[in-house]
Amino acid sequence: IAQYDAPKLLLRLDDNGMNHSVTMAIKQVAATGMPFSSSVMFACPWYQEAVAVLKQYPQVSVGVHLTLNSEWKYYRWGPVLGQSAVPSLVDSNGHFQASTAAFLKSAYKLDEVEKELSAQVERAMHSGLPIDYVDYHMGTATSTPELRAIVEKIARKYRLGISRYFGENYQTMFAVSVETKKDEFLKRAAGFSKDKVNLMVMHVAEATPEMNALVDMNNTDQHSDTKPLVAMHRSAELNTLLSPEFQKLVKSGAVKLVTYRDLVKEQGLDKMKAGN
């Protein structure tokens, strides 16, 4: 199949810099040479490793994963600005709320949201990486019209794209079972739209002791007392992207990989509009 006929696939690998296991998985994908987009959590303790890795792989388009939540049971983080600067955004321990629902129920102040999310973008800008876009961890930063307006304002101020504002056809593998992830991904790839950019949001990680220890406080599908489901899900997504079957699709030109850097270049920032 000629490349110009091929459906466009935008891989967005989220949670970069959340911990070592996620960043090392994203490094494995980057080492294939594939162009993709990766969203970094600049509020997390490991973000500097993500920055160092991404500097080695300029084909990766970098975004800021705007973060207002901290969802793991024993591994928590808080605002870049510190709890005293944005007290309405944190719980009694100074961490972000665990879920979107808990955040929305809390007495968060919009001006503090704007200050903190701006600080996350500033930290990204100061990292030395070229930053192309923003998106939103767990959807919290766009979960009300007022919050969404803040994200749009920040993107305008820093001249950044916003994920899902370029008419993308959005999909995720998050809820697909561990056993069927690869087959389901390949099945979807065979049916990708040629009219729109197919955005596939992925969460990859290496199945390490660090990853095995993570318990998602919000997600019963990925929590079990007997199995490290988070690690199993995320390593299955990693293995899907590294699989010979997917690599063959890319190399044969059956799908054309694009990034947010490409979309910003082709469509510009002024036509951006909130999508599905």
Where do the language-model regions lie?
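Catalytic domains of cell-wall/extracellular-matrix polysaccharide-remodeling enzymes
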Residues: 107-194
